[in-house]
Regions:
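Preference for long, well-ordered alpha-helical segments
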Residues: 125-128, 140-199, 206
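Transmembrane signal-anchor/signal-peptide helices with a preference for the extracytoplasmic
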Residues: 41-53
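A structural-propensity feature for long, helix-poor, extended segments
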Residues: 50-89
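Long, charge-rich low-complexity segments
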Residues: 79-91, 193-206
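Conserved phosphate/anionic-ligand binding catalytic regions in large, soluble enzymes, centered on
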Residues: 17-40, 140-158
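Short, hydrophobic/aliphatic alpha-helical segments
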Residues: 3-21
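Amphipathic alpha-helical coiled-coil segments
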Residues: 59, 66-73, 115, 122, ...
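Amphipathic alpha-helical interface segments
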Residues: 80-149, 153, 165
Length: 206
């Protein structure tokens, strides 16, 4: 089921249930899309304003990228469900089945792929939001800050959905490679999102 076609209320109700999906990965994707949209809204409120004529072309181009990014993040809600279900099924294989370990290993790696991609998309979103925060309408700068906070939360949430799976991998080389990618993104873009938030916040007290 593509939960992005349901209402917000329905999404939250299913999220709170014992259904295998959506879970943390799907929620991270949705929050990332919301954060991206908040940044994009700043762009929408900037375009067409004489005060920002010098940056209008840049903002329009950035908005187009964010439009695509929002869609891609929303697509990850269903992708996470599709890529998690094989792992959920693998847990049902009897422990004495000789194929269990190999099936679990493959399914676990597949389950990591979507949250890793969500993280990559969130990093891209944070870069875009930093531009909206710096060059977009001052009347909507708080929304850029909110967007950065949301996307950082999505970045962190997605990482946990990687780590819970890499912990169980037998192939530690693959696990550590994925962990390293996550740590690098968390360090660089978590700090960037924090800087956006602090800069926006400080601007209200000058």
């Amino acid at each position: 089921m593509d939960m992005t076609q349901e209402s917000c209320r329905k999404f939250v109700e299913v999220l709170a249930s014992d259904a295998p999906a959506p879970g943390g990965g799907g929620a991270a994707a949705l929050v990332g899309a919301i954060g991206t949209a908040l940044g994009n809204m700043v762009g929408s409120l900037t375009v067409g304003k004489k005060k920002y004529a010098e940056v209008e072309a840049e903002i329009i181009a950035l908005k187009a990228k964010c439009d695509a990014l929002q869609t891609e993040l929303l697509n990850q809600v269903e992708a996470d469900e599709v890529n998690f279900l094989p792992l959920a099924k693998a847990y049902g294989i009897p422990k004495d089945d000789p194929t269990r370990d190999a099936v679990m290993e493959e399914a676990t790696i597949i389950a990591c792929s979507t949250p890793l991609h969500i993280m990559e998309l969130c990093c891209e979103a944070i870069e875009y939001i930093s531009v909206f925060a710096a060059k977009g309408s001052r009347l909507a700068v708080s929304d850029a800050g909110c967007g950065a906070v949301c996307v950082k939360a999505a970045l962190q949430a997605a990482s946990l959905n990687v780590f819970i799976n890499t912990k169980t991998l037998k192939n530690r080389e693959v696990a550590e490679e994925m962990n390293a990618k996550c740590f690098a993104m968390l360090d660089k873009y978590g700090a960037m999102a924090d800087e956006i938030f602090e800069t926006v916040k400080a601007g209200f007290f000058k």
